[in-house]
Amino acid sequence: MPAQSLLQAIAVGDRILLDTSVLIAYLDGDEASHPVARYVVDDLVASGRNPGVVSMVSVMEILIRPMRMTPEGHHTVLGFLRSQPYLDLVPIDIQVAQDAAHLRAMQRFSAPDALVVGTGLATQVRHLVTNDLAWQSKLADMTARISVVRLADHLPFPART
């Protein structure tokens, strides 16, 4: 079963943060990791198997391309995000800012990445789902608290018809 490695990495009920790269891959069928992202969003999060969290930084980032394409292009993306009952869109608050500042100071994350990861820490997710190679090494000392699951590590993944 192609999804087996993903199912082993993310246990039933574990809360997961979806990074911007996951959402972009989900929305863009031409992305190499689209089949994995689609499985994570449609089969794990949308089903309720794994509640998902998305930072407002990621929301902002995934709205840029649709806004550039057409004036109302982002409404489809917003509608999708708002229609997901098991997906929490998390605003940046003082705890997220504090966690992000720590990540910037100690692991030298970029400000956007620090805010995204900080959202995951503040909301106590078990896994950060991303396609960012650097996150695993930067967060290596935090594996007891949080793990990094990279989409690319689960390729090849068959596309759905």
Write out the residue ranges for each language-model feature:
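Alpha-helix capping/helix-boundary segments
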Residues: 22-23, 58, 96, 115-116, ...
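Short active-site oxyanion
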Residues: 48-52, 86-88, 124-127
